[in-house]
Amino acid sequence: MRIGVVGAGYVGLTTAACFAHLGHRVTCADVDAAKVRALSAGEVALHEPGLRELVAEGLESGRLRFVQGSALSDVDYTFICVQTPTGADGEADLSAVEDVLGRTSTPVVLKSTVPVGTAARHPGVVSNPEFLREGHAVEDFLRPQRIVVGAQDERQAREVAGLYGATRAPVVLTDNTSAELVKYASNCFLALKLSYVNTLAELCEQLNADIDGVTEGMRLDDRIGASCLAPGPGWGGSCLPKDTLALLATARTAGVDFATLEAAIATNRHQPRRVVDRIRSETGPLAGARIGLLGLTFKAGTNDLRDSPALVVAGMLAREGATLTAYDPCVTGNRPGIAVVGSAAEAAAGADVLVVLTEWPEFAELDWPELAQRVRVPLLFDTRHVVPPEKAEEAGFRLVRIGH
């Protein structure tokens, strides 16, 4: 099948490279000429395991090519994968989607996350929401947990589902509106779980309970599940903040009081402040304090800094007068108020406290005795529960964690 993909960002590039890997002939278009030149040369700026290799494979086989623009011809389907950022009113900005729809004459498949009801205004459009986790995008595309396709024409829906090749994943064929809502409902439910566990962690601190023991007991219940039960500095990234606001705006327009979602958003906005307050309670006044930060991306496995709670925490610390030095394995170049260095040892030098803000697995394997020698005060605040307590304590650190 000849497939066109508009948008060479995180979703679009993964979609294009994976479809080419499955044997389709794929043309990926983007308005950014520099990005198109780089991708045509096999240069992938995104940190996504396996993606660079799939792009190289597609280019070498001739099944994948990149062009500049926002419309494609001579394809059987055009997959729209452009961004839909949040506007000032909390609703998604559909200008990029509408631009592509206005320029495209081929059958269209919407992968971009769009407000519920968007496809209904464009007869013939197929809704095929993406469920890609950053850091696992290639795996999620090639071995999906489910494929959701919404369309007015069941034959067309089945044809789009068939593009994914042989898969054991359940295929959900439904109407456009329901397919659009599946994406929002899924992401917002994950946000609810994350906010719930962060509030539960706060309660554990007041009751002298252990959040790890509590969540271990919870995740063994199949009705609850094991994912999204780790406390942290808050949720962020390109999806959850945007999608929660968009679904809340949709609910308000529909006259539905979505109080649970409002509470989850409010809890998340408060969480970075709670982290900063906890740091201050351990160190005293933050003005003049030297703080080493481990992790800046919104989660491990990606170089994505969009809406990262780590940056929110860092901004609050800087505004209170702290001097910040940070190390993240996927971030280079200083950020406002943050000196970004090339190693954890550099971030630890002279620090009054080390704060883990991203759950990079390599942080568990750091030379903690060496870091203990480099800090001024051996205090470690692990907001992500990534460092084994015995390692930190044997190295001489006093360990503080959310939910303890």
Q: Where do the PLM segments sit?
A:
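Structural/interface elements that position substrates and couple domains in central-metabolism enzymes
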Residues: 1-404
